[in-house]
């Protein structure tokens, strides 16, 4: 399906571009969200007639987004979750969770503004991109921890996941050391028998 874009769409084009997309993408995303119109002759003429108005509105929204960017970019938000000893979460942190954390922190955000390259399934600090406008994005840090105290330690630069890995590695090394120092089953009998033979000689 060919559509005319009503705003910039990442990896697709700029406002006014006529592009070809898959029917499902157009019907399920672009058209219902008013990001594009079917590229019919009537719709293209309609767009051109409103282009100046749309560009002015887009510029206004972009300026507002840039103002929000100066406030939210680089901010950190804490999300507390249950996790195992190795830091793996019982579940994951969703875009809705992140939007809620931002709202609780005083910033208005919708879940569809949150971009996750992959699900957050471990404790730690995770960089997340927030789309404030088709041409303006901000990066925030999501501090996922089991407790407030852990969140503060992570914010101070401590890697609790790495610390757990180091502790486990040290425990394994210690166990292997003591095992190597102990005699295997039957070694004591063999050693005693050898001493008896030496005594007879």
UniProtKB/Swiss-Prot annotation:
This is Large ribosomal subunit protein bL9. The keyword Thylakoid does not apply. GO terms for molecular function: rRNA binding; structural constituent of ribosome. Keywords: Ribonucleoprotein, Ribosomal protein, RNA-binding, rRNA-binding. GO terms for cellular component: ribonucleoprotein complex; ribosome. Binds to the 23S rRNA. One of its GO terms (biological process) is translation. The lineage of its organism: Bacteria, Pseudomonadati, Pseudomonadota, Alphaproteobacteria, Hyphomicrobiales. Pfam families: Ribosomal_L9_C (PF03948), Ribosomal_L9_N (PF01281). The keyword Cell cycle does not apply. Residues 150-201 are annotated as: Disordered. The gene is rplI. Residues 150-165 have a biased composition (Basic and acidic residues). Gene3D superfamilies: Ribosomal protein L9, C-terminal domain (3.10.430.100), Ribosomal protein L9, N-terminal domain (3.40.5.10). It comes from Parvibaculum lavamentivorans (strain DS-1 / DSM 13023 / NCIMB 13966). Signal peptide: none annotated. Transmembrane segments: none annotated. Belongs to the bacterial ribosomal protein bL9 family. Residues 166-201 have a biased composition (Acidic residues).
